Amino acid sequence: IQHNTAIADGVSGLNEALAALAQQGIQMIYDETYMVLAQGNFVLAVSEGTYGGEPTSYYDLWRVESGKIAEHWDVMETIADQSTWQNDNGKF
């Protein structure tokens, strides 16, 4: 079950979405994973990379069932230029 409204359910839905991005010349790149947290059958990954060339944070939450991904939620946010930050804490 996919909760990203731009992606259809299932592996084929993910493949179709990534192919559509590639046709538009948009790359979704994960460069670094800062933490992976798990509790029960939920796993959260907090990562950084680029989306369409822009610095981006990725938060992916999966629900695992019988050893397979059963559900996925995600949040992507463009990381603002450091000169605009209101603190020195950073995104991660």
At which residue positions do the language-model features occur?
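C-terminal and inter-domain tail/linker signature
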Residues: 1-92
